[in-house]
UniProtKB/Swiss-Prot annotation:
Species annotation: Human herpesvirus 1 (strain 17) (HHV-1)
Protein name (Swiss-Prot/TrEMBL): Envelope glycoprotein B
Gene from which the chain derives: gB
Post-translational modification (record): The cytoplasmic tail is phosphorylated by the viral kinase US3. Phosphorylation may be linked to a down-regulation of gB expression on cell surface.
Topological domain ranges for the Intravirion compartment: 796-904
Subunit structure: Homotrimer; disulfide-linked. Interacts with host receptor MYH9/NMMHC-IIA. Interacts with host receptor MYH10/NMMHC-IIB. Binds to heparan sulfate proteoglycans. Interacts with gH/gL heterodimer. Interacts with host DEFA1, DEFA2 and DEFA3; these interactions inhibit viral infection.
Amino acid sequence: MRQGAPARGRRWFVVWALLGLTLGVLVASAAPSSPGTPGVAAATQAANGGPATPAPPAPGAPPTGDPKPKKNRKPKPPKPPRPAGDNATVAAGHATLREHLRDIKAENTDANFYVCPPPTGATVVQFEQPRRCPTRPEGQNYTEGIAVVFKENIAPYKFKATMYYKDVTVSQVWFGHRYSQFMGIFEDRAPVPFEEVIDKINAKGVCRSTAKYVRNNLETTAFHRDDHETDMELKPANAATRTSRGWHTTDLKYNPSRVEAFHRYGTTVNCIVEEVDARSVYPYDEFVLATGDFVYMSPFYGYREGSHTEHTSYAADRFKQVDGFYARDLTTKARATAPTTRNLLTTPKFTVAWDWVPKRPSVCTMTKWQEVDEMLRSEYGGSFRFSSDAISTTFTTNLTEYPLSRVDLGDCIGKDARDAMDRIFARRYNATHIKVGQPQYYLANGGFLIAYQPLLSNTLAELYVREHLREQSRKPPNPTPPPPGASANASVERIKTTSSIEFARLQFTYNHIQRHVNDMLGRVAIAWCELQNHELTLWNEARKLNPNAIASATVGRRVSARMLGDVMAVSTCVPVAADNVIVQNSMRISSRPGACYSRPLVSFRYEDQGPLVEGQLGENNELRLTRDAIEPCTVGHRRYFTFGGGYVYFEEYAYSHQLSRADITTVSTFIDLNITMLEDHEFVPLEVYTRHEIKDSGLLDYTEVQRRNQLHDLRFADIDTVIHADANAAMFAGLGAFFEGMGDLGRAVGKVVMGIVGGVVSAVSGVSSFMSNPFGALAVGLLVLAGLAAAFFAFRYVMRLQSNPMKALYPLTTKELKNPTNPDASGEGEEGGDFDEAKLAEAREMIRYMALVSAMERTEHKAKKKGTSALLSAKVTDMVMRKRRNTNYTQVPNKDGDADEDDL
């Protein structure tokens, strides 16, 4: 009874409120309507159940007389209607309402109308009580800090070494008359003794010309150039590499002197000092030189600081350690300023030397991989997860720390980690955070060692300090000391690191997505629950004002509802097709002046051929079966009503035009759900070991070995000089040695004699070489043949002169004498008659004068050579001779006849 009293009070309050509202409506309806109110006559027929006025034209339709409508032009609102007394004028001035409604239905074909009968109370519902919302999931035990990640050091230990050896070459040559042939070449490499390295090479920059070594358990000695022992100067190599230098004593190979048809031997000893790179890998029991030579001794072996326990495979007399050794630069002859401890080892092929250093500070089995400024440590079950956005990686470790004492040769880990952490802290966190304790070390999956320094902000640090002081005051004064570490006597081991980091990156991706999704779903669930509880309170109050809308939104379909105390009675609404609904164009009540309908009147059919039902348009396309929504008519009336998929606009209680939903600005009532989308995260390329590290991890660099072996001849030998075998070399060598023993005078005489002999030998050698050349022999043969041919023709000509001088000297004249057509010929031939004595005398005279002319020309030619006086004498002689001779002959014409040309 106590609980029902307030409810009855509220119901009586509602009843009295409705009664007062009804009286107000009646008083307002009794007032006369405005004389200028349009549409009264048009609405009268519709209100009395008459036919509705046709609908106005659709928006955007052009007038009847305009053949070219403009596109995208909104229809102009119709002119204000005339007074209600002229219904025909109103119908003619306005477009029909039915055409407008057809256009709206065509644009929104999915809009339906509903007829909702009043609920009877047969079905009642109630709202659920507010639920208890879940709490937001708390995060894990997160700790921020600085981390340095270490990986296995696969790089070898590198150091500089010096090789001392002598290349011994013994060549056997057989000399023929025109060629030389190698019958055998023996090459070997001998080590340099310790004394020669220290006293000769390092002290003076010289090397002995002999090589003493053991082969097949026999000690043998090789002499350079097959001569006695001397000191040879070391000179830089021809082509030095970027990583090493070299020195040697000779460029050319020594070949024996030429002695034909004999086998000769020649020995070359080339002392070579070469700086090379050496490398050794864990456990550092041996090292290899850049030349490919292995040394089966630890590079840290020695006689100091317990290094004699390191591995060695050689006898004790083959090794020597020199303290206070000052190395010398063989190029500049400069001596080092600081002494070193020098190790020297002799092998059967070479002697190697290097500077000794202790093993502990020099090598480390772990190396620094990544420095992480922000590393987040979280606890998941029985493991720690170290995550970093900078490297997109998550490492999983145990909850217990990993002692550094278990890492073999791990002295560098603590130092490198502290240096990196101090540098990062000073750069980023010095003003905002403090360090919590000492660095912690954890062994992660995959063989990564994580050095982690936890950090704490200054604000939290102050709170923790206060709480710590408070707890310390409650503890007993003498706490028990912690037990010693269980790993104090643990054996050392080497950590093996995997070459791939993909598993850690996949773990990071999974953790990133899991954390984001879980946090997002947790926030969504909490927000959704709280929102539902808030809306439930609003719905409980809103159902009292509009139970139909609240019930429809709750049930999910159109229903009608009314309150029955604290519950709602609901009834299902019947859908009506949009084509079966017609709206009236007037909202005035003709029988009651001053009263108007507050919502438009409609006529509809439940079925296409069913009877017409009169009603009133409700909210949200609801078709009310009653027309009791009445209000007093007011001036300046403007209303928009939802009709189908759009709106109809009434002005002064008369239809004006229709609008689509797009013409009305929409105000959203939805609350945006603040869900953070998964952020884009780019994975940067991350390599545990680079290609250079992997390539450099081996003990032997085959590329460097091949390069050095192929450059050896180029560096320590002259490959461009060619020595030709000379048969006279032995003779010249003997003459040179003979004159060398006679002092300075003998050397001077020897130079002259050897020069003359050399010229003669060169000339003979030149002729011999020319004759030995195929082209030279051919040329000589051709010249000999040409000489023989010339001698033959000369001999023949002389014989002709002796037998017939005239025919030999004057062959053309002789031919004319033989020609029978010549009128001067006697016609008798040589066989007929005797010669003419007169003509014979003339011929003899002509020959005598020809000899005289020839003598005069020779005299004149000689006078020209001797000078002017002789020339004058020749002229005078010529004049005398001209006066003495008689011109008893005529000059023979120079032109030959055609017959002579034919004879020729």
